[in-house]
């Protein structure tokens, strides 16, 4: 049985965290943070987080500060972030996307929208990781083939030089 993907839910409202877990169901393992500072602590310790659901408006450290730290460590290259926030202004949405979020869901939201967008983000990042692995494997294979070709060519040149430098025997 495959291990469940881990989702970090960052929201200062315990009710919101519980609601998101209930919407997403038992197919995931959940980590919870009540503020941005706690989220960063968890992200520093855990390398197996598949997705972050992030509220923007929180005490101590807001969602934008969390995104800034994630950018500094390039965590968003590996972990998609979906903002779920009651922030109404378009500037917040634009700023969140500029900071690298995979998606933005405004509250109030429909259950099916949250479920679908989480699945889509996880699927897209899994495909991206698989493509990155394939490209990396191809680069290593080409590099290995190039080294092998250089070795063969150097032996051919060496044999040619030996053949050229030998005195020709006349009969």
Please provide the spans of the model-predicted regions:
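Two-component/phosphorelay signaling modules centered on CheY-like receiver
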Residues: 2-5, 13-32, 44-45
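Helix N-cap/capping motif at the beta->alpha junctions
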Residues: 32-41, 63
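Short amphipathic alpha-helix used as the core "switch/output" element in two-component signaling
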Residues: 41-42, 64-77
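Receiver (REC) domain active-site loop signature in two-component systems and cognate sites
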Residues: 58
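C-terminal output helix
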Residues: 91, 109-118
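Single conserved hydrophobic/aromatic residue that forms the stacking wall/gate
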Residues: 163-171
